[in-house]
Amino acid sequence: MTRRTSNLITLAGALLLVVLGGGYVARAAIARSVFVTQARAALGTDVDVSSADYGGGVWDVRGLQIGSHASPVRLDAPHATIEGAGGATHVAIDRPVVTIGVAYDPLAAAAGLPAQLAAFERAYPHADVRFHAGRIVLPGGDRSFDSIEGTFRVAGHPDAPSDVDATFDGTLQLTDGNAVYPIAARASADGRSFASLQAAALPAAAFATFEPADALVKPVSGMLRDLDWEETRGTARLDGVTFDVGDHRLHGLHGVIAFESGGVGAKKLAGFLDGVPFDAAGEVHDVPHVGWLYDGSRELRSDASLLARIAAEPELRSVHFDTTAPGLGFAQYAMQSEHGPLAISVLTIDALEPTLRFDTAIAEDHVISNGERTSAMGVRTAAVAGVNGDYFDIGRTYQPQGMLVRGGELVRGPVDRAALVIDSSKHVRFDEFHIAGTVRAAGKSFAITQLNDWPAGAVTVITPAFGKTLPAAPGVTFAALEPAGGAHRFRVTRVAAATAPQPVTFGVAFGPNAHISLRPGETVEVRYRLDPDVPGAVAAIGGGPILVRDGAWYEDPHAPAPDERDYRWPVIALARVSDERLLLVAADGRHPERSVGMTRPEFADLLIRLGATDAMALDSGGSVTMVSRAPGDATVSVRNVPSDNSAERWVSDALFIYSSAAAPTLVPAAVAVTPPPEARPAP
């Protein structure tokens, strides 16, 4: 849509160049002597143009580059014709009307429009200029703006001194059959930039002429109303507009679209996708997210590829799209499976979008906590979207069962099951990780077995992220440490059995089988890292099982709760489609009237159909929560329907997406009339 509108404006700019070509193509009128010089150069003879009929800056023909033709050019003065071979340029001068026919128009070329203009005429000296678009051939010659599309009419009187910039206020007129659509415009003297362009209505199909032949999005019918373009942005209302998107059709669309510097946004659209109710909300940014948008790469990207995949689902009942931030889109699908209805929520992440980053959050900022809702963590940390995280000790300590990296720091050590790690380039690794580290004291070395785990096993490192208090734990001893110079050197400040709660400081806890003894004042060395190492890791979270590996269902041998494999209930996962695209996907469950849920194999199959090459589940069941910033909101909110009496569960941690881009400026709400439902066409 942006590319088509740009071409329309470029065309209008070329027409205004023609109008202003009466005096101002290169920002200043060419003096009569220059015209004479060009004519002499072309004809090889003197030309008398002294008559006032040809002067006054009302018109000249310098833009036709008469003197540039290799073949002779003939001029019959005073009311005859300028003709030239090569470009087949001719000018017929017959007062009071000047008619110019152009096979190749350098005025259009000057405006950056490689088109062939059939003819225009200007009533002399101060009347309308009419451009008769008998045929405008676009690059390649396979697309044209034919006479059936109408006539542009430009009215205005851009007379100005030759040493100042002129502006043009006038009206373009598009005729489509018997209907006439005026377009008010203001242009600079060189015709290359519009200050404004307004139209009460334009047929959407008129834009198809300016669409490249291989474009995936093609306007078919309907109207654009209240078009208002200013400089690089504008808005318009869709009124029953139909687009063909690849092999699919979006039709009966209503709503407001917003054009801005390469992106098209919408506060609200409603219509049908292949007969399925479709709606979209929010503002789309420079990277298109909604399936019917045209992208300069001529590929459907982000949610668009998702749209094409989902549209092929025979059980699809409805589609909803909106956008959260540049590079981040939200989609929701209502589907019908053989087991009952399904509600699928999807966050699509453009891994190449520089304003997006991943991180994790932990309940109340501590490993041991009272739990916190995913949405509350998102609001507290100013996230724009996210999902719940790892399995956890529900109702007690709320500590996550698996690993956690927050802000590049290892906060909770891994266990013997899957986790995912995300680096600063938003590359994701699904694997089983371990903690590799040692505590060295008095010439002895002890392997670290865990980080911020309680009660402590053999040797566990405790950091301030653990919580405010170390609970009592029989048989566990805690040695508090303070820096002793150097990155990994510490001094023991106290050693105490964990027979009663005590304040948390950095230190080492060891169980009865650790066979380690530390004394106050002793110097120790503490080192630990993830194994395998992931350079530049910024976020990591535990979960599992791995559901998809190399594009196929994967039976994870270390799946948590293996007896839940065939439960049909809420499930959620992070999936990698490519190095450029990630998906967070949630399937609601335990709502027979809305969504019955999916088994792990069923969910893996859905992820594969969405394009996943690799995917890992997170904590499922009642914990499944997806949040994002809805259009018009400043903070995140729950977008799916959790299964705990439709209420959000308190959890241990969450995986979030953050954006440094400014919050979108929303266009005014559309007055949209949703078309009545209609049956899906037979396959």
Mark where each language-model region is:
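Hydrophobic residues on conserved beta-strands that form the core of alpha/beta folds
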Residues: 47-49, 61, 75-77, 88, ...
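Generic short beta-strand segments
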Residues: 62-66, 94-98, 132-137, 169-171, ...
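Elongated, acidic membrane-bridging lipid-handling scaffolds
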Residues: 73, 77-78, 84, 111-206
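Strand-loop-strand
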Residues: 167-172, 254, 260-276, 281-304, ...
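Gly/Ser/Thr/Pro-rich low-complexity, intrinsically disordered segments
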Residues: 301-683
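Terminal hydrophobic membrane-targeting helix
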Residues: 20-102
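Broad, structure-driven detector of short, well-ordered beta-strand segments within folded domains
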Residues: 75, 80-82, 150-152, 183-189, ...
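Hydrophobic membrane-insertion alpha-helices, especially the h-region
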Residues: 9-24
